[in-house]
Amino acid sequence: MALSAYDLTGRAALVTGAASGIGRASALLLAEAGALVHCADRDETGLRRTYDLITGAGGSARTHPLDVTDRDRVRAAVADAGHLDILVAAAGIMHTSSVLATADEDLDRVLAANFKGVLYACQEVARSMTARPAPGSLITMASGAVDSASAGLLCYSVAKAAVVQLTKTLATELGPHAIRVNAVAPGWIRTPMTDRHDAAGQHRAEATMARISPLGRVGEPEDVAHTVLHLASDASAFMTGQILRPNGGVAMPW
């Protein structure tokens, strides 16, 4: 078995949030492992850059400009992609406000992107997989924020906690169809999203996370992408309903 378990030749993956950060790194690594990668994002410029990086390295990719909060667009992208073996639901946004300052529209916007967008992608891809039928792997993106309380991150943390429960429920329901469902809950990862968030605090959060990590650094998108590849591949054939935490040891829940 060895490294052949990570060979995705002949498989197809849909990656949302593929224009940057964790989504892009995951798309690149899945393509390097041999998968045809369907890259989806609302940022068309970033999406084209991801496509160019994949194809420039000899990989195979297609692009699907879409907003994951639009169920009809997600459904259309899944139909256009056709056969899918893997989903990486990595699209998401961050919002910062205290609990008392959180407005309805703030909560609605974050839940739409970070929970409903994941739900829509999982529903549409799972329907496609069960209709064939064929085994598959759905990978959701949770967050280390579900393991601790962080001031200002109510909307984000609530949405990511919902993703964890969605993942476990889907794993229970889809297991009989040979579809595995797992979540990745990264710690602080250096991405355009976290850079924008941390800039307001003069990058104190990143420095703090690096200091408290036993490994002495924050993560890079590639650190998470390798976890995604593991879950997408046959190397994790007996894993479902699990939450994997590439976080540098910042949190160690049992």
List the model feature ranges, each with a label.
Residues C122, A159, T167:
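Active-site helix of classical SDR
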Residues S98-V99, A103-L111, A205, M209:
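Substrate-binding pocket helix/loop in short-chain dehydrogenase/reductase
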